Curated annotation (Swiss-Prot):
Name of protein: Ribosomal RNA large subunit methyltransferase H
UniProt: S-adenosyl-L-methionine binding residues: 73, 105, 124-129
Function field: Specifically methylates the pseudouridine at position 1915 (m3Psi1915) in 23S rRNA.
InterPro entries for the chain: Alpha/beta_knot_MTases, RlmH-like, tRNA_m1G_MTases_N
Record-level GO cellular component terms: cytoplasm
One function term, GO molecular function aspect: rRNA (pseudouridine-N3-)-methyltransferase activity
NCBIfam families documented for this protein: PRK00103.2-4
Natural source organism: Bacteroides fragilis (strain ATCC 25285 / DSM 2151 / CCUG 4856 / JCM 11019 / LMG 10263 / NCTC 9343 / Onslow / VPI 2553 / EN-2)
Amino acid sequence: MKTTLIVVGRTVEQHYITAINDYIERTKHFISFDMEVIPELKNTKSLTPEQQKEKEGELIAKALQPGDVVVLLDEHGKEMRSVEFARWMEKKLVNVNKRLVFIIGGPYGFSQKVYDAAHEKISMSKMTFSHQMIRLIFVEQIYRAMTILNGGPYHHE
């Protein structure tokens, strides 16, 4: 089973890129994990936020495969502590036959089409983070979950 993080737009700041790639590589010691970047839209000034979400939603839909289990990172999703998230991941890793796909949307969130394709929504926090920063926070939590499940020394309760 493969786990994929889909994000809209490239990561710009080099220190985030370095840290994200480090956690992705660390996570690959435990599971098949990668990050897929949907190119950011060009000429968005003429689009309403709703139109931008629709166009991004079309690109996200093209990146999905039949059988994917889709989980949105969404401010209205379920919040979990790290150990809870690890147990949640464990269940998903056992029960998902194809890909477990996490999606971080664009600046205005997700289109209804993407919400309709989702199986679940999770939230990283009640706080708002930049789209650059949440990528790093999330890949670190995936790595942390894997170390919890495998008895590694990374997480301290």
